[in-house]
Curated annotation (Swiss-Prot):
Name of protein: Envelope glycoprotein J
Species this protein is from: Human herpesvirus 1 (strain 17) (HHV-1)
Residues passing through the membrane, by range: 50-70
UniProt entry keywords in alphabetical sequence: Glycoprotein, Host endoplasmic reticulum, Host endosome, Host Golgi apparatus, Host membrane, Membrane, Signal, Transmembrane, Transmembrane helix
Lineage top rank: taxon: Viruses
Family, per entry: Belongs to the alphaherpesvirinae glycoprotein J family.
Span of the signal peptide: 1-21
One cellular component (GO) term of this entry: membrane
UniProt subcellular location: Host Golgi apparatus membrane; Host endoplasmic reticulum membrane; Host endosome membrane
Main location group: host cell
Task performed by this protein: Inhibits host cell apoptosis. Induces an increase in reactive oxygen species (ROS) in the host cell.
């Protein structure tokens, strides 16, 4: 995989994870009945039954993005090490 593809996958994974995390809404903050002031159960997620798969998918996208960005960092540092005057040459 080329360095550019790794870079784009890393950015895409990070952005998808951030968007999914930002769009997920938890239970409602006000959980009391306005008339009786009795506690009520929170409203279901506005995403319905898809909330858990979206969160898991977002976490997977974040992990993919982090792995790609770490691979990019590893390749970049290896490339810099080849030209450092005080280091032995790196055999690839």
């Amino acid at each position: 995989m080329s360095l550019r593809a790794v870079w784009h996958l890393g950015l895409l994974g990070s952005l998808v994870g951030a968007v999914l995390a930002a769009t997920h809404r938890g239970p409602a903050a006000n959980t009391t009945d306005p008339l009786t002031h009795a506690p009520v159960s929170p409203h279901p997620s506005p995403l319905g039954g898809f909330a858990v798969p979206l969160v898991v998918g977002g976490l997977c996208a974040v992990v993919l993005g982090a792995a790609c960005l770490l691979e990019l960092l590893r390749r970049t540092c290896r490339g810099w090490g080849r030209y450092h005057p005080y280091m032995d040459p790196v055999v690839v």
